[in-house]
Amino acid sequence: MKYNKAVMTKLINQHRDLHDELKKIKVEMGLEKNLAIKALFHSAVADNGPYMKEYQDLERLQ
């Protein structure tokens, strides 16, 4: 599965907990938004993460 910023952004906008986690990553790690989104992808979606199925569903709609 490949990282797609547009799909990841949609997923974040649909889930408040992902949005909150994104903010937390930005502050704690001092990352800019794009890198924080990518980090969130690797922690919450990639490698059978809890949001992998929803991400794949959104990706199919693209």
Where does each model-flagged region fall?
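Compact alpha-helical subdomains of small soluble proteins
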Residues: 53-56, 61
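N-terminal acidic leader/helix
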Residues: 1-29, 34-35, 43-54
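A general structural motif at alpha-helix termini
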Residues: 40-44, 59
